[in-house]
Amino acid sequence: MNRLLKTVIENNRKWISEGKVASYIPELSKMDKNLLGISVCTLGGEEYWEGDAEVKFTIQSISKIVTLMLAIIDNGEDYVFSKVGMEPTETAFNSIVNLEAKESHKPINPMINAGAIVVASMVAGKDSDEKFDRILKFTRKISGNNNIDINLNVYTSEKETGHRNRALAYFMKSTGALKGDVEEILDVYFKQCSIEITCKDLARIGVMLANDGVSPYTGDRIVPRYVARIVKTIMVTCGMYDASGNFAVHIGIPAKSGVGGGIVACAPRRMGIGVLGTALDEKGNSIAGTKILEELSKQLDLSIF
C-alpha cells in the first residue's frame, strides 16, 4: 500500500502547477503551494501514509460534515432538513443566488457556506463558546486525536475578512432562514473552519464513516448508523461543491473538500482516506488531491457505482 501511495503522489505532483492556494483568506494565502500528502486507514485499523501526511492545515469546509453529524444527533434529521435542503447545486460554495431565487430562502444544502452557517446555528449550546467547544471535542472524538485544536491566526483572519459569509448570514436572518444572534453564529462558523488537522486525522474520520459510524480501533459506535449514512450520501451529491457530479463519475466515493487543501474520503466498508494538496482548482478543490483520489480509486476499484 505504501508503494502505491508513493506512486500516486509522484504521478500527480505535476498538477500542482495548475492550481493556486486560497487567497481570499489572507492567512491561507501564506500556505506552501507544493504540499502534497495522503493517509489511508483500513477497516482493520491499519494505517498507511506518504508525503506531507503529518503537516497541519485548517479543516475549512470539511468541518461541515462534522457539524452536520452533530446537528443531526442534537436535533434529529427531520428538524435539520426542515432548515436546510439536501439538493446539489451548480453555483459556487459562497453564492447568494439560490437564497434569493428559492421561495423558502432555505439554503440548498449543508455543504455550501449558507447551509453550513444554518447548521452551525443548530449545534446545541448556551452560547458560541459552548457550541464550538462541543464541535472541537466531537472532532477530536471522531478522529481519535485529543490534541486537535484551533489555529487562532486563521480564525482571526477569517473573522476579519469574512464579508461574504456575513452577507449570506444577514440575508438569511432577514428572510427568517437563520435564527439567533448572527455574529455569535458566525463566530462558531469561523472557529470550526479554523480547526487544525492532518491527513491522518482525516483518514481516521473517513474510516469511521466507512465503517458506518463505528471506530475500527476501539469497536465503539461514534455516531449513529443513520447519521453516517446521511452524511456519506450528502458527501457524494454535494461534498465537492459544484464539481460533485464530475467527482462521482470519475472517482465515485463519498468525499468532502476544504479550501485549506484537504479532502476526506471514504470507501464504504473498505477504508478512509485523507489527502492534502494546497494548490486548488477554480472550484476550490485540491487539484492534485483530486487527481490522486482518481488514480487511487481506479487502482483499488473503490467506486461505489
Swiss-Prot record:
Substrate binds at residues 61, 113, 158, 165, 189, 241, 259. Homotetramer. Its EC number is 3.5.1.2. It is an enzyme of class 3 (hydrolase). It comes from the Bacteria. Keywords: Hydrolase. This is Glutaminase. HAMAP family: Glutaminase. Belongs to the glutaminase family. One of its GO terms (biological process) is glutamate biosynthetic process. GO terms for molecular function: glutaminase activity. InterPro entries: Beta-lactam/transpept-like, Glutaminase. It comes from Clostridium botulinum (strain Loch Maree / Type A3). It catalyses: L-glutamine + H2O = L-glutamate + NH4(+).
